[in-house]
């Protein structure tokens, strides 16, 4: 068998394998919520949070990314940190 025939067979096999690739998947989601209230004549933020999720398979493996943020003018720093930790575990 000559090298040209082997090269043609190899090329056909490679094209056949690469044509069976799975489709690219990308899903993104985000949500945000805020509540404010006037307390002692000042507008205070009771809570302000945002959550972003992203799932894609750009590298061939599903990758899930989760980002969240939380702020409040009326909660103590310890309470804020506890809520942030709970949001990051979700």
Curated annotation (Swiss-Prot):
The effect of residue 26 to I is: In strain: Praslin
User: What InterPro entries does UniProt report for this protein, alphabetically?
Assistant: Acp26Ab
Q: Sorted alphabetically, which keywords does the UniProt record give?
A: Behavior, Secreted, Signal
Sum up the protein's function in the record's words: This protein is transferred from male to female during mating and may affect egglaying and behavior after mating.
- Which tissues show it? Main cells of the accessory glands of males.
Know the name of this protein? Answer: Accessory gland-specific peptide 26Ab
UniProt lists the gene as: Acp26Ab
| Keyword flag Phosphoprotein | no
